[in-house]
């Protein structure tokens, strides 16, 4: 499965490629590895789907931008400029691994202190909206970009694309099962369903 800059893990570990970049790569164009070298397929593919993590889709990239609304949250300062060119090197791996571990276990799941936001989350049965770190517009904008990129690059009979995302829930011992949710047409929801909504894939 394929991740872009919108997946929390991919962005933390240096991925800056967009969904458009991913589709161009699948069709045979070179793409830049986070460490600066080019990668290219030996043969173009016939079909492809960008399957970014539904959970926190687009959020880590937003935290890294100090000018964005999510980037102004207190914990986000550690992420500012994370994937600026001067920081894309092996010297930042330890920092990235630490950020990955701390974000997943603490900041991203802290409940919001805004009572109106919490009420809205409860009334709409929208769990993710009730967390302090979540910004609906950022999340939906990333998903919209993924869906629109799939539509732009879809050329049936030559190169087939699918709107898709990854749903992964953790089990005992932090084991997990990756599920790629793939839509058969352009009728996708306004935002993907993730483990933050429910750990039950059914």
Please place each PLM-identified region on the residue numbering.
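Extended, charged catalytic domains and RNA/DNA-binding interfaces, predominantly
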Residues: 1-202
């Amino acid at each position: 499965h394929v991740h872009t800059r919108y997946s929390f893990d991919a962005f933390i570990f240096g991925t800056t490629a967009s969904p458009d970049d991913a589709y161009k790569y699948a069709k045979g164009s070179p793409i830049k590895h986070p460490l600066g070298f080019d990668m290219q397929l030996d043969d173009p593919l016939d079909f492809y789907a960008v399957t970014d993590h539904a959970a926190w889709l687009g959020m880590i990239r937003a935290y890294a931008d100090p000018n964005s609304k999510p980037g102004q949250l207190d914990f986000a300062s550690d992420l500012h400029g994370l994937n600026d060119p001067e920081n894309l090197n092996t010297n930042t791996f330890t920092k990235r691994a630490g950020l990955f571990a701390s974000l997943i276990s603490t900041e991203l799941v802290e409940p919001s202190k805004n009572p109106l936001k919490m009420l809205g989350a409860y009334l709409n049965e929208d769990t993710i909206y009730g967390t302090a770190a979540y910004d609906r517009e950022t999340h939906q904008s990333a998903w919209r970009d993924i869906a629109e990129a799939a539509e732009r690059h879809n050329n049936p009979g030559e190169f087939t694309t699918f709107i898709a995302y990854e749903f992964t829930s953790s089990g005992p011992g932090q084991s997990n099962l990756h599920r790629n949710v793939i839509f058969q047409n352009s009728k996708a929801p306004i935002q993907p369903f993730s483990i933050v909504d429910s750990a039950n894939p059914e």
